[in-house]
Amino acid sequence: MTLREEVEIRKTFAIISHPDAGKTTLTEKLLLFGGAIREAGTVKGKKTGKFATSDWMEVEKQRGISVTSSVMQFDYDNFKINILDTPGHEDFSEDTYRTLMAVDSAVMVIDCAKGIEPQTLKLFKVCKMRGIPIFTFINKLDRVGKEPFELLEEIEKTLEIETYPMNWPIGMGQSFFGIIDRKTKTIEPFRDEENVLHLNEDYELQESHAITSDSAYEQAIEELMLVDEAGETFDKEKLMTGDLTPVFFGSALANFGVQNFLNAYVDHAPMPSGRKTESGEEISPFDESFSGFIFKIQANMNPQHRDRIAFMRIVSGAFERGMDIKMTRTDKKMKISRSTSFMADDTQTVNHAVSGDIIGLYDSGNFQIGDTLVGGNQKFQFEKLPQFTPEIFMKVSPKNVMKQKHFHKGIEQLVQEGAIQLYRTLHTNQIILGAVGQLQFEVFEHRMNNEYNVDVIMEPVGRKIARWIENEADIRDAMNSSRSILVEDRFENKVFLFENEFATRWFLDKFPEIKLYSLL
């Protein structure tokens, strides 16, 4: 198979949603259809003893939420699919954001009872900004929820994107009968999936069935006719630019409508795209020369070995285990002899991978998030990955001073994952951690105890706003202000931490010569 042929069968996407919309459950069912797993363990496994394949970290298993981004690959219908299950909790938006930089499309899961929720909106905006195709799966149709037209209107108005329903539900909740596939004019019954029913062009049922006298069926047919009369067509160009989302109805937990979605997804989702360098050059996925970038670092995927894995998205060319690659940031060459693919915590050695694939590289501390890796004598850097400005800051120290070595190793590794940000006060070298949300600190505390055997003390510093210094101004007078704390980030950039917006404005008025900026 040529490189082009290998690349063209790849599909790489992330699943995004608000917590509890059914994102991880949908991931499990997709893996089932891909033959990657034999039995789905749902995230509700904290009661049943089963755990979701994509939820591998101890804290995830206990809480039933996804707080890391899991990467899984499976084969389906002659395609190789790379699926990234992103953190659902809003506190982990920074990790999710970076993950969305490594995919070519996204699947948005919506709870039919709740519609568009805050986290869904936030993540959608990131996808929209990237201009990647977005597929929508409206979940939990076997429960009572909003009407289909209401949901479509909410998506269009709130997200400012056109919708095109690929199928249509018959009833919902207790009266949920199934879905009508608009393309094939078939009905897939919820309770009897094998017994597919057929409609003619006028939506008349070809088989004799009691459903024809059901009011939910009559309503669904009337609604579908209204949709058809509106005359909207499925515009693939609009899908590719992120201006139209195909909508699917189903129930991930009941494994219903999932294969209908998956079949359409592999038909319409894009193959791997290229990526721009800092100089604006577009690197094509079909370029023979290898290139890739690190978008995530995860420590302790195997706590027995205290290992670190750097997740790399391949942008161009082919990766071969044992090949020499160069890290652009350091201009150093390295031989990659340990490379892996994932099924959550189950890993397999990767000998060969191409554009669109995501592989793990064992990391002894060489890699940073955003690193560009290239083959041969290439010299370019991909566009930088964005970083979020933290909104909560905590002083942190070990309860047991004899555990300093473990404490600092834990801090170093967890900070390098990018889930939490590190700062140090200028004169006392006090460690301060910054996060987007409170849950990140809870997970940090749990992992320090569980993975590094260190109990930590965390104290709020009373600061909520971080601003980086943009110019080389004299900051000696500003350092003595009681309304701010001067710290350095892990790259030794100087940062002021403020109590609130008022304190920030006061500082800017008092010291106009100091120019400040914030991250995203």
UniProtKB/Swiss-Prot annotation:
**UniProt domain tr-type G: residue ranges:** 8-273
A Gene Ontology biological process noted in the UniProt record is:
regulation of translational termination
Q: Which GO terms describe its cellular component?
A: cytosol
Query: Where is GTP annotated to bind?
Result: 17-24, 85-89, 139-142
**InterPro entries assigned to the protein according to its UniProt record, in alphabetical order:** EF-G-like_DII, EFG_III/V, G_TR_CS, P-loop_NTPase, PrfC, RF3_C, RF3_dom_3_sf, RF3_GTP-bd
The primary location reported for this protein is cytoplasm
Gene Ontology molecular function: GTP binding; GTPase activity; translation release factor activity, codon nonspecific; translation release factor activity, codon specific
Q: Which UniProt keywords apply?
A: Cytoplasm, GTP-binding, Nucleotide-binding, Protein biosynthesis
Q: So which residues are the signal peptide here?
A: none
Locations listed in the record: Cytoplasm
Free-text function comment from the UniProt entry:
Increases the formation of ribosomal termination complexes and stimulates activities of RF-1 and RF-2. It binds guanine nucleotides and has strong preference for UGA stop codons. It may interact directly with the ribosome. The stimulation of RF-1 and RF-2 is significantly reduced by GTP and GDP, but not by GMP.
In terms of HAMAP family, this protein maps to: Rel_fac_3
What family does this belong to?
Answer: Belongs to the TRAFAC class translation factor GTPase superfamily. Classic translation factor GTPase family. PrfC subfamily.
Q: Which protein, by its recorded name, is this?
A: Peptide chain release factor 3
Species per Swiss-Prot/TrEMBL record = Macrococcus caseolyticus (strain JCSC5402)
The organism's lineage? Bacteria, Bacillati, Bacillota, Bacilli, Bacillales
